[in-house]
Amino acid sequence: MILNISVSLLIFLAFYGFSSDAKSLPCSEVKKEYGIVCRCNATYCDTIEPLGTVTSGKAVVYTTSRNGKRMNRSELKHTTSSTAKTKVYVNTTQSFQPVMGFGAAFTDAAGINMKMLPQTMQDQIIQQYFSDDGLGYVFGRVPMASTDFSTHEYSYDDVKFDFDLKNFNLTVEDLQYKIPFIKKAMTASGGKLKLFATPWSSPGWMKTSGRMVGAGELLGDQNGKYYQTWAQYFVKFFEAYHAQGIDFWSLTPQNEPTTGIDPLWKWQTLFFDASMERNFIKKLLGPALASSPVTKNLKIMINDDQRINLPHWPNVILTDPTAAQYVHGIAIHWYEDFIDPATVLTETHEKFPDYFLLATEACAGYFPADGPKLGSWSRAEQYANDLIKDMGNWVGGWVDWNYILDLQGGPNLAKNFVDSTIIVNATAQEYYKQPIWHVMAQFSKFVKPGAIRVGINIIEKSVDVEGLSFLNQDGTKTVVLLNKNEVLSFDVAISDVSAPNVIYDLTIQPNSLITIVYK
């Protein structure tokens, strides 16, 4: 009995009972093929040492690195001079976009893997992601029906020619794998969770191909009954979730719409080009959403595809006043970022400054699809680099793909196995927090919704050091710096342009990410 009480107390303190003076539980390190992971089970999981009170003249530093540091906390006192060659100047008079927040997707695969673990571990994982003591995620992406990260293709109405959607119903996947965990996340976030929905395909009977999987577009005329039914399908979805006690903040009309023309595409998709999406929004989807009290305030994000589509996609849609009245943002994915530079995001913002930019999907191990690499630092660095590039070019928030997968990187009906921030080993009843998880923490813990990105100037910098700076609503400033060099450390001096003699001196180690919070 004493042992059981001790274990329960440990779990409670680890995930629910932090005070500002609490210490963290360190990473339970396990060396895997590609590096170090943090092992968690029903009785133990590492936690993040709280920031505490940040006072003038003191900085708090968190470090995550290839060599095993995982959100290690330290403190610095300011100096009045520095010999560091790399100077970082923060300029709070130069302001950019507000921060929207960070998040992940509630896929079938994630829910299936959660169900492989006991209730205590399920609750741990939700707390690790969505509570203030964890990553503090505020976004949840919810697929409408099946994706490749499902075990089979299904829609909410697979009855042919049911144009009135009389047979529309949520499925067992929603009721078992999505809704329970969404509700837990809503609670863990303290009501701050913002959900947005995205379809991968219409029911197969609505498509030219006759199947959800593979290329195809909606049948018939763009104002015809198939398109009309598809618009009403969205309303039905949101009303069904509303009946379950879940309301949404936003939606996108289609996940990666340009893939729907690829004859070799192996999972669910539906083709739209920019003009088709414009017409669908302005003539059918926008009016349909506006007609229901449940959906009338939903924010539509366009594109939800690679940034290679920019600025063409918003040029087509947002220059049409009727379509534009329904649109609030532009969604981007990261999979072809190597083709177009991040500056295309700034170009898009400058053309359409009234519309936010949100990164809505990313995962490592996708090209080729080779599943998880346990302990991989290079994948963690991929995330950090993309976060810096995106947010440095007007992207307001960043949403990861599956929040948990198995050791294979699934389940996935197309064998499109990829990586995730958390990987579950159901046989051992444990899970592994990848370095990616802690990289996300370096941003999401200290760059809160409502913060403003501010100016940063790195002088005499190495090409391997890059970063961002933010002004938080509580008056603290956050600087995130990434060192991509595998060998060299860099001495860095951080100061405000407005207070050049208040300097924080530190060394950023090879292959490391640091976050500095000061006032």
Curated annotation (Swiss-Prot):
Metabolic or biological pathway: Lipid metabolism; sphingolipid metabolism
SUPFAM superfamilies in alphabetical order: (Trans)glycosidases (SSF51445), Glycosyl hydrolase domain (SSF51011)
GO BP annotations, alphabetical order: glucosylceramide catabolic process
Documented EC number(s): 3.2.1.45
Keywords: Hydrolase, Lipid metabolism, Signal, Sphingolipid metabolism
Signal sequence extent: 1-24
Alphabetized GO MF terms: glucosylceramidase activity
Active site: 256 (proton donor), 361 (nucleophile)
Reaction catalysis annotation: a beta-D-glucosylceramide + H2O = an N-acyl-sphingoid base + D-glucose; a beta-D-glucosyl-(1<->1')-N-acylsphing-4-enine + H2O = an N-acylsphing-4-enine + D-glucose; an N-acyl-1-beta-D-glucosyl-15-methylhexadecasphing-4-enine + H2O = an N-acyl-15-methylhexadecasphing-4-enine + D-glucose
Pfam families the record matches: Glyco_hydro_30, Glyco_hydro_30C
Gene Ontology cellular component annotations, sorted alphabetically: membrane
Coiled coil: none
Function: Glucosylceramidase that catalyzes the hydrolysis of glucosylceramides into free ceramides and glucose. C.elegans contains specific sphingoid bases, which are unique or different in structure compared to the sphingoid bases found in other animals. Two examples of these distinctive compounds are: 15-methylhexadecasphinganine and 15-methylhexadecasphing-4-enine.
Stored PANTHER family: GLUCOSYLCERAMIDASE (PTHR11069), GLUCOSYLCERAMIDASE 4-RELATED (PTHR11069:SF42)
Family from the record: Belongs to the glycosyl hydrolase 30 family.
Protein name in the entry: Putative glucosylceramidase 4
